[in-house]
Amino acid sequence: MARLAAFDMDGTLLMPDHHLGEKTLSTLARLRERDITLTFATGRHALEMQHILGALSLDAYLITGNGTRVHSLEGELLHRDDLPADVAELVLYQQWDTRASMHIFNDDGWFTGKEIPALLQAFVYSGFRYQIIDVKKMPLGRVTKICFCGGHDDLTRLQIQLYEALGERAHLCFSATDCLEVLPVGCNKGAALTVLTQHLGLSLRDCMAFGDAMNDREMLGSVGSGFIMGNAMPQLRAELPHLPVIGHCRNQAVSHYLTHWLDYPHLPYSPE
């Protein structure tokens, strides 16, 4: 029996309209009744996730910013990882050949250089939003991550440019087909979950995890039971071909699997 369940949010626990379904909320409550520790592991900001947990009265640990922050049930900061100032400076000031928009994150929030209303659709659940600033004036020592949002082909070309400029000084990953992230070296959800399990006196073998994108790769590959969403990025399936694939987030597939796991643990599971 797993003792901790870690969930990605977008494309996994959240439905396509960016809400948590009633079946999902009910299943999370059942897990807590079984004393299974809940952990939300997401690229979203800690401020937003703390608001969501409060609104839903959920007790859960938080891995946010794709592993840049880990918070306890009480909101205590357990782990932090920031981009080196020289890396942040290079990414912010360099002229990249891309049409993608740039977004900067620190403990105070989400910052970008211009209004992009379409991006706010993903935050209807919480009301979290960006702040408009001159990105050249961002404090370089406080940046947790930088991400670029745009078309996938454009971002793939940008990824090559970033690799050439940064080398091994940053970790690059796609958190969605339309979002490329620049993170501290060694920073990912799997590394953050390792920190959390050590804090809790657990091992990664005691954990199950669910995800759909390349920013979930390390987490899914390191836990005792990793599950890939039916709507996952093809690259993730290719990287972890041995992991089982469940259903689509639009059908609350995580809840569907966990209900079977709780009620019929000894029977084989089918996502249909």
UniProtKB/Swiss-Prot annotation:
CDD domains (UniProt xref): HAD_Pase (cd07516)
Keywords, in A-Z order: Hydrolase, Magnesium, Metal-binding
Entry keyword annotation includes Magnesium: yes
Cofactor(s) needed by this chain: Mg(2+)
Coiled-coil region: none
InterPro entries: Cof (IPR000150), HAD-like_sf (IPR036412), HAD-SF_hydro_IIB (IPR006379), HAD_sf (IPR023214), HMP-PP_phosphatase (IPR023938)
Stated name of the protein: HMP-PP phosphatase
UniProt lineage: Bacteria, Pseudomonadati, Pseudomonadota, Gammaproteobacteria, Enterobacterales
